[in-house]
A protein has these predicted regions:
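Bacterial signal peptide processing site
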Residues: 19-22
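Terminal, low-structured helical/coil segments at or just beyond the last alpha-helical repeat
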Residues: 24-31, 35-50, 207, 259, ...
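Alpha-helical segment of the N-proximal tetratricopeptide repeat
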Residues: 52-94, 98-105, 135, 139, ...
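Helix-start (N-cap) detector for alpha-helical repeat units in TPR-like alpha-solenoids
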Residues: 59, 93-94, 127-128, 161-162, ...
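Canonical tetratricopeptide repeat
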Residues: 64, 98, 132, 165-166, ...
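Structural signature of tandem alpha-helical TPR/SEL1-like repeats
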Residues: 72-84, 94, 105-118, 128, ...
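Structural marker of alpha-solenoid helical repeat scaffolds
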Residues: 88, 122, 156, 190, ...
Length: 325
């Protein structure tokens, strides 16, 4: 979230593949985290057996040790040091904020909210704490609460592009795409050429039906240095909506293997009503990889069903040639 930018996925796809997605920070794998924590319980027991002869760290030193472990991406040990810091000095807000951010990254949202609210009891004007609470609520789907927390965070720190970006995510989930666009533009006014925000702005335009403008912002995100598979996928979907099928396929290929790229193009076409060409794309995906996962076969059956219901005619009249790029 670095300052975290929470992942925000919109809606479960009814077909396999091609889901548009917000560009965000991946959360720490919780199952793996638990394994690490269990292993480090034993390691810590060995460490504690020698602590009696080792100098005890001050809260400040524990926090610095946590920072070092966080930079190494050793998150369980970082959390251990931050916890020791706040246990020794409960009013140490800086360590508590870091502990809350770490909990956010690990998906421990209720625990993170507890840490941030504890900070607010001593510093009600902590924009970082309000932002952290909003991030947790957003992940939990508590959109009204997230919006309220972000409104406070932005009022306290209008220079936070992260809060503006998060507010855009909230608005998009509330289907308030025009408000989301305004929030993303406010974020870009603070931090121009931020790839994550450019991607999110492009997707907000796509969700509102303006795929041409969406393409412009997706391409700007690429030009700004992003090579995210999610971005390439979003751009591919937008290209497909503008009937730029060759460009769409090439964009999908940058995000995934070739069979999956054909499957995703087929999904986009089927959703747009062009079942006839979608069917050919699904067949191509299976041809390239006969063992291609069940999604392509399921999508192929869906395309065949749609064609059968339309008496074998393409629903969309935009593409006459029955071929997939």
């Amino acid at each position: 979230m670095r300052v975290l930018i929470i992942v925000c996925i919109f809606g479960a796809a009814t077909l396999g593949g091609c889901a548009e997605s917000k560009d965000t920070t991946s959360s720490f794998d919780m199952s793996e985290y638990r394994k690490i924590m269990e292993r480090q319980k034993h390691e810590q027991a060995a460490v504690e057996s020698t602590e009696s002869s080792a100098p005890k760290l001050s809260p400040e030193e524990e926090e610095r040790a946590g920072d070092t472990e966080a930079q190494r991406r050793n998150f369980p040990m970082a959390g251990l040091h931050y916890t020791k810091a706040v246990n020794a000095e409960p009013t140490r807000n800086s360590a508590r904020l870091k502990l809350g951010q770490l909990m956010l990254q690990q998906g421990l949202f209720d625990a993170a909210v507890t840490q941030f609210k504890d900070v607010l009891t001593r510093d009600p004007n902590s924009a970082v704490a309000h932002q952290g609470i909003a991030q947790a609520y957003l992940q939990q789907g508590k959109l009204q609460e997230a919006e309220a927390a972000l409104t406070k965070a932005i009022a306290l720190d209008p220079s936070s592009w992260v809060s503006q970006n998060l507010l855009g995510l909230v608005y998009d989930q509330q289907q308030r795409h025009s408000d989301a666009i305004a929030a993303y533009k406010a974020a870009l006014a603070i931090r121009p050429r931020e790839p994550n925000v450019l991607n999110n702005l492009g997707l907000a335009y796509a969700l509102s039906g303006d795929h041409e403008t969406a393409i412009q912002f997706f391409e700007q995100a690429l030009a700004a240095g992003s090579n995210s598979p999610k971005l390439h996928n979003n751009l591919g979907v937008a290209y497909a909506h503008r009937e730029r099928y060759v460009d769409a396929l090439e964009s999908f290929k940058k995000a995934m293997d070739e069979p999956r790229a054909y499957n995703n193009l087929g999904v986009a076409l089927l959703r747009m009503g062009n079942a006839r060409v979608a069917l050919v794309c699904f067949e191509k995906a299976i041809e390239l990889n006969p063992q291609y996962y069940e999604k392509a076969s399921e999508n192929l059956r869906q395309a065949q069903k749609t064609l059968s219901q339309s008496n074998g005619k393409t629903i969309s009249q935009s593409t006459e040639a029955v071929s997939c790029p």
